Amino acid sequence: MRTEARGGERRRGAGRPRRLGGSMIAAALVAVVLVHGTARAAEEGATPHEPSKFGADWQSWHANTNVTDMPSVQRGARNFVSYCLGCHGLKYQRWSRLGTDLTIPADLLQKELLPPGDKLTNYIHTSMPAKDAETWFGKTPPDLTLMARARGPNYLYQYLKTFYVDPSRQTGVDNLRFPSTARPDVLSELSGMKRAVFRDVMAKGEGGQSVHQQVFDHFETLAPGRLSDSEYDGFVRDTVNFLDYVSEPAQAARRALGVWVVLFLLVFTWLAWLVKREYWKDVH
């Protein structure tokens, strides 16, 4: 009886390596799906909104960045140099790295993007002195190298799309994403001038009392810009896409390498399971 009991325990234990191996393979498959899905989601983003329909849903607008879209990143670099570099720098990024990653020849980079007197080996700095900037704007414009990682591409996209005329502000404009911003709307020649229309709503304040609140409703165009709504939307997406790349230049390579690493682990797990099964076959 004791021998039979032990034999039964061995038979029950013999199935454990198989179940364990199956679980390991299943876990590896799930990991592959998650990594692939995350990379795709990061590249594709959410469904874009219709740029001509400005409304109260601005907080759900998505940049839909894709740093592997090289033409978009290249256009974004051009946009940044033309409209942003005068105030904002990229102090952790070199011109040479920019040219290499964006496949821009050195002579073309020197001709089209580099400021006069700058070198390819230099970091990308703004020419505006920090003290002068603080005097003019009340604070020094931030460096944008890591802004996309700190705030997220969607934040930058919404910020650049929600400027509106406000005569009470020193710069003449304000922003929905960043109220009381010190930044002037340097892109108004492209986007045009818009007025924000707010509506009164009743809300509960302190002590449960009803209070009036101003809630954004929609934009009204006061003066058209050089670009149509869809063209300006593409301009902003390219610019944000470039800043997303700058925040982590190796992210495209990292995602591609990550898939191969997970596949390697999957194959290694399967081989390890085969060895384990062969080993336990002799034991049982």
What do these predicted ranges mean?
Residues 26-34:
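Bacterial N-terminal signal peptides
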Residues 37-41:
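Sec/Tat signal peptide C-region and signal peptidase I cleavage site
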Residues 103-207, 216-232:
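Electron-transfer interface patches adjacent to heme c in soluble/periplasmic c-type cytochromes
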Residues 257, 268-284:
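Juxtamembrane interface at the cytosolic side of transmembrane helices
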